[in-house]
Amino acid sequence: MPVITLPDGSQRAFDNPVSVLDVANDIGPGLAKATIAGKVNGELVDAVDMIDADAQLQIITAKDEEGLEILRHSCAHLLGHAIKQLWPNTKMAIGPVIDNGFYYDVDMEESLTQEDLAKLEKRMLELAKTNYNVVKNKVSWQEARDAFEARGESYKMEILDENISKDDRPALYQHEEYTDMCRGPHVPNMKFCHHFKLMKVAGAYWRGDSDNKMLQRIYGTAWADKKQLKSYLQRLEEAEKRDHRKIGKALNLFHWQEEAPGMVFWHNDGWSIYTELESFVRKKLREYGYDEVKGPLMMDRSLWEKSGHWDKYAENMFTTESEKREYAVKPMNCPGHVQIFNQGLKSYRDLPLRMAEFGCCHRNEPSGALHGLMRVRGFTQDDAHIFCTEEQILEEVSGCIKMVYETYAAFGFENIKVKLSTRPEKRVGADEIWDKSEAALAEALKANDIEFDYQPGEGAFYGPKIEFTLHDCLDRAWQCGTVQLDFSMPGRLGSTYVAEDGERKVPVMIHRAILGSLERFIGILTEEFAGFFPLWLAPQQVVVMNITDKQADYASDCVKKLQDLGFRAKSDLRNEKIGFKIREHTLKRIPYMLVVGDKEMEAGEVAVRSRRGDDLGKMGLEDFIAMAQQEVVEKTIK
């Protein structure tokens, strides 16, 4: 007689084993109608799965994050159902859930077009609207293999042969005549899968291996209701308008070339943003007591072997040879900083030692993964390493956390999610060191009243880390900042200090980045502001325009005064209509346009317009300067 305990603590007793759906029905018909799955003792199960012992149960609906993921996974199966009806010879590979949707890799002779996607989406909707039940069957390994062999599903057979034990009982999900294999859970009925859209088709190698066959990957998005789907598609449309690659081209900020994949060509205005951002971070470093250093771009293979990078990270490193020695271009700054620490005897009185670098790093990312400024091969990290004692960890990590939040606030980012990533399978260091590291980071977060989630297995190979993820105006997540403890690398590279008792000890090393990489952060800012950078960051801050040649000298004088005070200002003295000039500079998103005619020249004034189209009226040049200076100092976002 199972006793079911619900999230509110209430209990319900049953005379016989019950399914999740039975319990939902017992609570109320409305809940039963909305039930997608259940979570029994913390484990997700299908709505039809039976509970035969006392258990904790949470009913999962489309309002839950897990429910939305299940719904999306079932839409992937729905895609399989539809594609096999339209193209029966298609071989199905894998169809997992991804952020905001799903995909399915398929092997078929036809190259799918946008028209084919529309036809496939239409058939999916026709099938879903019949509201058929999804039937789950647990079968033996051999029964599953026989089922897929009869259908010629070679990829499913390979998954069974290589990834599933013959002692297991795989779950087969029946969508009318279509059968798929999955760990589940899935929706009990297709009434939950009416709100989806197929987005695009791309190529993908089977198992991500370029030696294998290229498949077609069909991407889709799915949501709980029509309103959510519409909202998501609108966000995508807005994201397309804000694409930093388009804005970068329109504003002449940067470009890329095939001759240097993943490397950025910075133009004058783009580099202005870069250097301003660097200066902002440099000022923060001084406030928080960091020394700024610069390490070499390449170092001998032997150092990377000692640090552990050669063993764990070699495939991502660019290498070269000279005079029979092998070198690696640095993918990270940490080993170089350890070398600087190791110069000269260090005492406990020298700790904490905070070392920062705008370090130029290179990583051999796959060409298919490169994406504008967001995923590059050459980038600059706002990297820092703090060498400290174990007793100083809490205070130092707390300082890093405070610095992260202050920096993000300057750009208007307030929605920040924090995760603590713990030990991965491939790692260096003993388990007791990892225990100590993970506990120290968790303690620092709790001490600063920071809510966080654990990410098991997602830490770097040398230590656990705190990850700070920004959410932008389109609610997209960008993981930028990290604070990472490392009890391993200093010891591996021979770092010691003289403790208070005269003994030699190995310092703790804290890896810290706030922006992550300057390139990627500029990409994020470009899309966040849609190119309307705040005044302090804008590459061109002010343009002064004359109406006729008569005011050219006055306009030039205004520009010189602005430039002398540090403003990035220029004049536009072309013999063009003022309306034409205003439109042109508005499109360039220059924050302020100052128009000078005879009246303004005689009164020593300027007529001020903003890039948003606001006419701010006439004011003395000194008054405008005071207003603009305040905006720069306060880092106002408009």
UniProtKB/Swiss-Prot annotation:
Compartments reported by the entry: Cytoplasm
Catalytic activities: tRNA(Thr) + L-threonine + ATP = L-threonyl-tRNA(Thr) + AMP + diphosphate + H(+)
CDD domains: TGS_ThrRS (cd01667), ThrRS_anticodon (cd00860), ThrRS_core (cd00771)
Residue ranges occupied by any TGS domain in the UniProt entry: 1-61
Top-rank lineage group of the source organism: Bacteria
Textual note on the cofactor: Binds 1 zinc ion per subunit.
Keywords, alphabetical: Aminoacyl-tRNA synthetase, ATP-binding, Cytoplasm, Ligase, Metal-binding, Nucleotide-binding, Protein biosynthesis, RNA-binding, tRNA-binding, Zinc
GO molecular function: ATP binding; metal ion binding; threonine-tRNA ligase activity; tRNA binding
One Pfam family in the UniProt entry: tRNA_SAD
Listed GO biological process terms: threonyl-tRNA aminoacylation
SUPFAM superfamilies: Class II aaRS ABD-related, Class II aaRS and biotin synthetases, TGS-like, ThrRS/AlaRS common domain
Named cofactor requirement(s): Zn(2+)
Region (Catalytic): 243-534
EC id: 6.1.1.3
Binding site for Zn(2+): 334, 385, 511
GO cellular component labels: cytosol
Signal peptide range: none
Top-rank EC class of the record's enzyme: ligase
Listed Gene3D superfamilies: 3.10.20.30, 3.30.54.20, Anticodon-binding domain, Bira Bifunctional Protein, Domain 2, Threonyl-trna Synthetase, Chain A, domain 2
Entry similarity comment: Belongs to the class-II aminoacyl-tRNA synthetase family.
Assembly notes: Homodimer.
HAMAP family, sorted: Thr_tRNA_synth
Function in brief: Catalyzes the attachment of threonine to tRNA(Thr) in a two-step reaction: L-threonine is first activated by ATP to form Thr-AMP and then transferred to the acceptor end of tRNA(Thr). Also edits incorrectly charged L-seryl-tRNA(Thr).
Name assigned to this protein: Threonine--tRNA ligase
Gene: thrS
